[in-house]
């Protein structure tokens, strides 16, 4: 490995998990099954929505794109993670690391905005049902989804550009199972203050903005539901967004654990565990959540 700057680094060594050898095969099988189940579930949900004319509505247009995003970001990290269990030296080229980080960051960010958009969709469906067809027109929901992809691409491009323009002279060993931002920054011998600021500003804004949209949407939704006189009406309205609320709770609960836990000696290992749940388990759960809680999706 070169010692000068980032252009001299040709590859990184992904350290993966600090687990004993006898458990590696078990983890490999479990994570492989989760990944395959995730692919089957999300591809199946996309095909179901595409082929069933009853599901050609904004309420199912958004989960369709959520499934696509889940496929993309879990596929960006899981194959390389599985490789870490089968190879002693799990290497990734510099270019491969850049691409993995870019793809993962793009779709992980888009995921946040899609969940916020889906909360807004639930708000309009429950709080303004008579105006729903006018507000959530085909043009509007296509623009909203396109916007989530654009924001994800811009966010990821900025982070990728600033991260991989650094000088790496400490080591080429990334203490993670994929090319994630903070473990990569830990290898740099450059001043990373601007990178930390970008992380705080971009990631902080993305999380806070989307969380606030979701929180305020559900505040209005709950107020509207509580005002309903009919028990059946309340139940029907709540079931409309129950699947989304479940998905959001799991998604942001995991992110909160990842980014808000206090720093400690085992915090990096905890981050790896949370990253597994965020990057592999949640994409598997989403199609199950939507299919079980929506009668049309069964």
Swiss-Prot record:
Keyword Iron part of the UniProt annotation: no
GO MF annotations, alphabetized: G protein-coupled receptor activity; odorant binding; olfactory receptor activity
All ranges on the Cytoplasmic side of the membrane: 47-54, 121-133, 218-237, 293-298
Any single GO BP term: G protein-coupled receptor signaling pathway
Protein function: Odorant receptor.
Extracellular side: 1-25, 76-99, 155-196, 259-271
Source organism superkingdom: Eukaryota
Subcellular localization, as worded in the UniProt entry: Cell membrane
Keywords recorded for this protein, A-Z: Cell membrane, Disulfide bond, G-protein coupled receptor, Glycoprotein, Membrane, Olfaction, Receptor, Sensory transduction, Transducer, Transmembrane, Transmembrane helix
Entry protein name: Olfactory receptor 5AK3
Residues bearing glycans: 5, 155, 265
Gene transcribed to yield this protein: OR5AK3P
Major localisation: membrane
Residue pairs linked by disulfide bridges in the UniProt entry: 97-189
Alphabetized InterPro entries for the sequence: GPCR_Rhodpsn, GPCR_Rhodpsn_7TM, Olfact_rcpt
Membrane topology value: Multi-pass membrane protein
Gene source species: Homo sapiens
Record field: transmembrane: 26-46, 55-75, 100-120, 134-154, 197-217, 238-258, 272-292
GO cellular component, one term: plasma membrane
Family membership: Belongs to the G-protein coupled receptor 1 family.
